Design a protein with these regions (language model features):
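Conserved core of the PLP fold type I
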Residues: 2-167, 174-193
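Conserved core segment of the aminotransferase class I/II
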Residues: 191-233
Length: 233
């Protein structure tokens, strides 16, 4: 445990530590999440955050709220095993695509093929990517790869205007790979997203602050408009 985290926890009144928190989080929670993620309160996005029991709780919210019963979520073939369990527990399924191409880079083409297959038969499609520091491979997508992913998503959103696309980034290990500026560069690719698309971030403060057993996380919406952020909330 980081000494600064332990010091802060031990300085808190026991009543504050043990009492119920509001469903929407204590005052200042949304700003605190943004500062942890971006280093400041975002001016690029309309951001809303919902507290969850760790990153796992955020994943559950994404799968339950942004897929219909019987739908499949798309992700890579290298995954944290409980992704599949969470899907199946909530009446959803997991579809994967090969994570790496022949050049050992991220397989954008395989991702697009998987998305097209789901868009043909589902009204809602959820793409989940775990980066930086993918569990279990440790792979971090480059800025160029993330740019290509977002370009594909924008193209498909335009081709399927009656579908609802959700792009979910699981950044549970974002603070375990590279400098703050390097790891946050993945967010630079996310801009000018279409109206029929939602961008979510799975954030695990439990991991970032080295207190995994305390189960503190958030599902975060990065919206282009206030109306979209309010709808998420």
């Amino acid at each position: 445990v980081l000494p600064t985290v332990e010091k802060m926890l031990r300085s808190m009144p026991i009543e504050e530590m043990c009492s119920y928190a509001p469903i929407g989080g204590i005052p200042g929670f949304n700003e605190a999440v943004q500062i942890s993620l971006f280093g400041h309160v975002s001016e690029r996005f309309h951001v809303e955050s919902v507290p969850t029991p760790g990153g796992c709780g955020a994943l559950r919210h994404a799968i339950w709220n942004f897929l219909d019963n019987g739908d499949s979520m798309l992700t890579t073939d290298w995954i944290w095993g409980p992704y599949r369990n969470i899907c199946e527990e909530h009446g959803r399924f997991l579809k994967d695509f090969p994570m790496f191409n022949d050049q050992d880079g991220f397989n954008v083409e395989g991702m697009e093929d998987g998305l097209r297959e789901l868009l043909e038969k589902q009204k809602q499609v959820l793409l989940l990517l775990n980066t930086p520091a993918n569990n279990p491979t440790g792979y971090s997508m480059t800025k160029e790869e993330m740019d290509k992913v977002v370009d594909v998503l924008k193209k498909l959103a335009a081709e399927y205007p009656d579908r609802r696309l959700t792009f979910c980034l699981d950044v549970s290990y974002i603070d375990f790979d590279g400098t703050f500026e390097e790891t946050r560069s993945i967010f630079d690719s996310i801009h000018d997203m279409p109206e029929n698309m939602m961008t979510l971030v799975v954030f695990s403060m439990s991991k970032s602050y080295t207190m995994c057993g305390m189960r503190c996380g958030a599902i975060v919406c990065l919206a282009e408009t206030k109306e979209a952020a309010d709808l998420f909330k």
